[in-house]
Every structure is written in C-alpha cells, then in structure tokens.
C-alpha cells in the first residue's frame, strides 16, 4: 500500500528505510490480500552463511487428535496456492511491515512495543521495581510453573472486533502462548499465536505472529526483542509460512470451526548449537538462536502461559468493547467460544510431551476493575482434546 509521507511519522519512515536497506532482497512480491513480501537468500540471515538444521519433520506436528462430535477444519495460507508468486529457489519470505495506516500520532516506540507479557504472570519470582507496568491489558490464561523445553497446542481462529467503541487504532486481540524464563534479572520470553492488530498488520484480520524479548520488554531492537522479523533475531526457514502471514478462513459462530497448530521446541543440533524452533501446521517456520538469551531461556523455560490477551487504548480500558476470541464468554462453549486444545509441554530435551496441567489466571487493565473476559479450564480431560479450555468475551 502506498505511504502518504505527509500523514506518516517521519521517524517511522526512516526506520523502515533503514530496515529495508539491511536486507539482501532479491525479489519482492505481493500476496492476493496485499501483503508485501521481500525474498532474501536463506544464508544471508546467518553470520558466515551457516544455516541451522531444523529438528526432524515428524517433531513439527502437534497432537492432532479430534473428537468426531466436534469436527474442526484447518486454516489455510495464501502461499499454499501454487499460483501465488514466490521468490527464486534458495530464498525465504520476509514480511515487509505495513505502516501505511499509521499517522503522525503513532511513534516508533508505540508501533514496535508489545509489553503485555510483562504482567501476564504477576507471581513470577524475578519481578523488579523497574519492570514495565503497561496499562490497558487484559489476560485470561492457563498458567503452569516448572522446567520445560517446549510446548505445542492447537488454537481456534476467529476475527475479533477491536478498537471499539473508540480505540485509537493500536488495540489488539490475541490467542497465544508465552514461554518465559526467570533466571536473569530481566524477564525473557518467546511467544507466538495469532493476533488481530491493525497497527502491526495493516488490516483487521488474524495473522500468525512470533515475539521475543531478552530484556523484560524494556526495549525492542535488533537481537533484543520484537515482533516477527520487524527486528533482527528471528531466522526464517520455511518458504511458505512466515511470521505475520494472514490466515483464514476464520471460525463461524454456530458453524464451521477453524484452528491452527503451533509448536515451540528447544532443539540441539549435532554441531552443539541450540535454537528455539517454531512450527506452524506441522511446518518448521524458523527459529530464534538460543544465544540471543545468554543462558536463561536458551537453556529452559520456567513458566508456560496459554490464553488470550486484549489491549485497549481507551483512557478507561474497562469501557472497551474489544473482543477476545470469538467475542463470546467461555461458558458458551463449543461453536460459540474460542478454544485452545491438545495443550502439551515438552519436559526434556528428548522431546517427551505431557499434557499441560495449569491453573486459570486472569488480570485486568486497572487494579480492581471489571474483567469482561473469562476462561473455562478442562485440564487432562481424558478426551480427544486432552488438556483444553474455552476463553473469550465481549459478545458480538
């Protein structure tokens, strides 16, 4: 989409120019929905051109067990269509951030920042007085402490309404996983799921995202933290699925349910190097080098959170009508509320997976304020969905 230089914050325009100049782009394409993709040689992302080896393909697949009484269909991706233009062999897709909708009111920091993970687990042991304490965030999640080396699960996909009744365009609604480590003075986190976020994605549809921070959400920058491949850190591997890709179709209230699988795995290759690999729909999408974390999350996970996050930009966040999941509360259940199912934690470096057995937690945008969102847990259910829950709220 064309960018209006009069409307845009000059700081944002300069940042994007610098980012683009740092990529070794050999071809640029546009998807049917209008996303701009820059294709770069896969080895250009790596010092010395050394490309990491992914885990075995069979380990990319999450538990696909289904209940025949609750049929679910997978979402699709635009690059699944062989007719969609791609880059040449040996290149991988890097999404170009769409800043065309952003006005001069939106600063570079506002565009880049994601701080909700700083408060999603208020009981963490390494909390610091100087930690970010962002306003406007609501969470309803499944929380589990322990020592872990990965996670997988399946997320239902919806198109929640945001920026209602009068958000400033920076609101978001997310279903995701947080993998956090507390060994360092600053919280470290690797995250992923799907998000509806107009300022990040340029539209109001669900997109896959990844995020990481090595410094407790205090600064997003190259090799420090950030969404997708907005900053350096993420290494793209797949030629068809990438952070920021649009997904669809979404679930229909009372009708066809759609979902997507994700997997995070701390993997040590034969060379001894360790990386955080991320798979989507059974495809190894890419990874975060574990050395970004200087120990800490590069060794193990201390806490796994799975659930929903809503951010409202309103001065009184409790007045928001932003939706989480389907927009319906957890008690509405099958075909009405969003779910996350077949939730499993990796408990050793040998890829052993066990059912998640967390507890329900929530926090609100203002201490003592109302919580319009709910979660209903069914851990180790004994059924085809294993450990699962329904989550959401702010009915349509």
Give the predicted meaning of each segment:
Residues 1-396:
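Exposed, interaction-prone regions of secreted/extracellular proteins
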């Amino acid at each position: 989409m064309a960018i209006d230089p009069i409307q845009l914050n000059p700081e944002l325009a300069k940042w994007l120019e610098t980012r683009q100049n740092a990529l070794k782009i050999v071809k640029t394409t546009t998807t049917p929905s209008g996303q701009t993709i820059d294709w770069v040689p896969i080895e250009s992302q790596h010092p010395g051109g050394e490309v990491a080896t992914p885990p075995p393909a069979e380990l990319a697949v999450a538990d696909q067990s289904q209940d025949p009484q609750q049929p679910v269909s997978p979402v699709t991706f635009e690059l699944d269509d062989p007719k969609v233009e791609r880059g040449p062999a040996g290149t991988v897709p890097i999404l170009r951030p769409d800043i065309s909708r952003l006005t001069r009111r939106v600063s570079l920091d506002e565009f880049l920042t994601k701080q909700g993970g700083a408060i999603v687990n208020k009981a963490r042991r390494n909390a610091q007085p100087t930690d970010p304490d962002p306003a406007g965030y609501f969470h309803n999640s499944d929380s589990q402490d322990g020592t872990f080396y990965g996670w997988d699960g399946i997320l239902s996909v919806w198109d929640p309404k945001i920026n209602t009744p009068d958000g400033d365009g920076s609101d978001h609604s997310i279903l995701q996983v947080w993998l956090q480590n507390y060994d360092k003075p600053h919280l470290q986190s690797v995250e992923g799921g799907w998000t509806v976020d107009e300022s990040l994605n340029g539209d109001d549809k669900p997109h896959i995202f990844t995020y990481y921070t090595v410094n407790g959400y205090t600064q997003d920058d190259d090799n420090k933290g950030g969404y997708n491949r907005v900053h350096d850190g993420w290494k793209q591997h797949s030629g068809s699925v990438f952070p920021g890709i649009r997904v669809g179709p979404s679930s229909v209230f009372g009708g066809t349910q759609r979902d997507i699988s994700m997997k995070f795995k701390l993997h040590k290759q034969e060379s001894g190097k360790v990386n955080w690999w991320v798979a989507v729909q059974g495809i190894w999408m890419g990874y975060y080098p574990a050395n970004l974390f200087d120990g800490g999350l590069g060794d193990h996970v201390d806490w796994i959170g799975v659930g929903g996050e809503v951010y409202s930009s309103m001065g009184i966040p409790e007045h928001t009508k932003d939706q989480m999941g389907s927009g319906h509360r957890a008690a509405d259940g099958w075909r009405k509320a969003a779910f996350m199912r077949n939730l499993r934690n990796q408990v050793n470096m040998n890829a052993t997976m066990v059912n998640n057995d967390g507890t329900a937690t929530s926090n609100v945008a203002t201490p003592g304020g109302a919580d319009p969102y709910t979660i209903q847990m069914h851990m180790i259910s004994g059924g085809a969905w294993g450990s699962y829950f329904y989550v959401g709220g702010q009915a349509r």
